[in-house]
Amino acid sequence: MRDVVIALIPAVVVSVVFYGLAELLVLAVSVISCVALEYLITKYLLKAPSTVGDWSAAVTGILLALNLPATTPWWVVFIGAVVAIGVAKMTFGGLGQNVFNPALVGRVFLLISFPTYMTNWTIPGGLFGADAISGATPLGIINEGLMKGASAADLIAQNGLTYSQMLFANIGGSAGEVSAIAILSGFIYLLARKVIKPWITLSILGTVAAVSCVFWLADPTQFTDPVFNLLTGGLLLGSCFMATDYVTSPMSTKGGIIFGIGIGFITLMIRYFGSYPEGVSFAILIMNSTVPLLNKWFHQKKYGRA
């Protein structure tokens, strides 16, 4: 898990640079809360040796923070940490036993329970000014505009949503949405260290690209293009760091590919037809529930057996 923390450093640094001290506070509260809660639950409730040294609680804290707006109140962040660690992870017995990604369970709980705070997006404004200006995410802009009868292409042009902004960090949203380059650099590091395999991520991104291309070619006024869908929202963070969590993803390559295809398809269906502009978190959690079945269908053959 230490490698995952290292891989997340570019995203953390970029988020703090662009969202300022407010994001630093969210990160600090989230990480400290997750680590402290795991330590206390393990020692005093489970009566077991501390597991904080495996870095998994720190990873959950960082990922939870990157899934939240920079202006999220500290007490809301703490509640998210309680749900992520106390409910989604330790209730199942700790690392290796949980069915669902803890950080995403925390995020979805907060999204449902505190929608006002969870949709109070800020525009990147530097180290001291990030919490001053509110704005919509690119997906939110498109979703709201389409409901008013505008075309997707016009909305992208009118709001100056460029691919370079999405790549190099200059868009509103959760901290983890701020820069595609930062996320991808961490993903490449994990691949180089052989911490993860690329199949799940590639199947997610490939499905989103292929399916969105079909819809976009059918009606470019109502559906956004593949590149826009790949670079916006939490797709890259989710596909590179959360869908690839070895505890909550399939063990086999075939199972992982089906897992990724499901995530990509569900994400796009929620984006295009759902009430929420973003569907990555819901898609990953839904597919997390299929992992036991996928592992049963596509179990790895044991060495020495036919």
Task: Tell where the protein language model's regions lie, with residue ranges.
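Loop-to-transmembrane alpha-helix initiation sites
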Residues: 99, 103, 226-233, 256, ...
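C-terminal ends of transmembrane helices
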Residues: 36-48, 85-96, 185-194, 240-249
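Hydrophobic, membrane-inserted alpha-helices
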Residues: 7-14, 38, 57-65, 81-85, ...
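Cytosolic-side transmembrane-helix boundaries in multi-pass membrane proteins
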Residues: 1, 272-306
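N-terminal signal-anchor module of multipass membrane proteins
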Residues: 1-35, 39-42
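Long hydrophobic alpha-helical segments that form multi-pass transmembrane helix bundles
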Residues: 102-184
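Structural signature of hydrophobic alpha-helical transmembrane segments
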Residues: 21-33, 71-80, 166, 170-180, ...
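Membrane-interface helix-loop-helix junctions at boundaries between adjacent transmembrane segments
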Residues: 62-132
